[in-house]
Amino acid sequence: MSWDPAQYLKYASERLRPALDLLARLPIEAPQTVVDLGCGTGNVAKILAARWPGARIVGIDNSAEMLAVAKASTSGGTQHEWIHADLADWVPKEPVAVVFSNAALHWHDDHATLFTRIFGWVAPGGMLAVQMPDQYAAPSHVALAAVVSSERWRDQLGPLLRRSPVAPAASYFRLLAAEAAVVDAWTTEYLHVLPPAEDGVHPVVAWTKGTALTPFLAVLDGEAQQAFLADYSARVTIAYPALPDGRVLFAFRRVFVVASRAMR
């Protein structure tokens, strides 16, 4: 699956805000190594480097397109290391002080196994910090499921539909509490005010083109893509009516998990 960094970065500030909120909950002062799981274009990794200038920042992502942007933005520097790998396969060579993941783990199933595995990477006194979209019940994703399941698209796109792997915040507390010294898990719903899209595309469609729509658009050719987007846009326009000035209110729910490992 190919990602479009430019499309994703159209709403860079809105996508960055949850990462900043997550980072604010980490009291650790001078970690030696910080792993950014699902680092994407490197926006968050650069903020991690600014927060901890003495740390080695290791960005992991399975998108070559995203990593190319990340590498270009930090060329000439020595603080960052970029690794092209799948989160399901990659393992650090040694325990890590901070494992940070912003808007990536919702693409992976079996969170009971996944979270147990990545918390196992955390060094004594270290922290795991995760933020994940929890948007499957929102109108944007309900509309997507309805279009994909329609007679026109279900044979080709239906197999790509996934059940949300993201559980309620309390589930992650229960999952990690036995191994962690402290677990802090919560849910936040952001109300984004999206500006009118410059190309006339509904703002919520423009947003989801950078994320949730990507797997579906990847298997369609140009003409089919436009037909699919038209079907999706028709539903989204009803679900998210524009304000008089063309802006759109877009509620977005996210789950946060911070777990600390005790010092030995």
Spell out what each predicted region is.
Residues 31, 96-97:
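Local beta-strand N-terminus motif with an aromatic residue
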Residues 33-37, 41-90:
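Class I SAM-dependent methyltransferase SAM/SAH-binding core
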Residues 103-104:
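Short catalytic micro-motifs in class I SAM-dependent methyltransferases
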Residues 3, 179, 184-244:
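C-terminal helical/coil "lid" or tail adjacent to the Rossmann-like core of SAM-dependent
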Residues 1-35, 43-47, 66-69, 73, ...:
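Conserved class I S-adenosyl-L-methionine
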Residues 181, 254-264:
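Core SAM-dependent methyltransferase catalytic element
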Residues 112, 119, 123, 127-198:
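Conserved catalytic/acceptor-binding region of the Class I
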Residues 100:
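A conserved beta-strand element that flanks and buttresses the S-adenosyl-L-methionine
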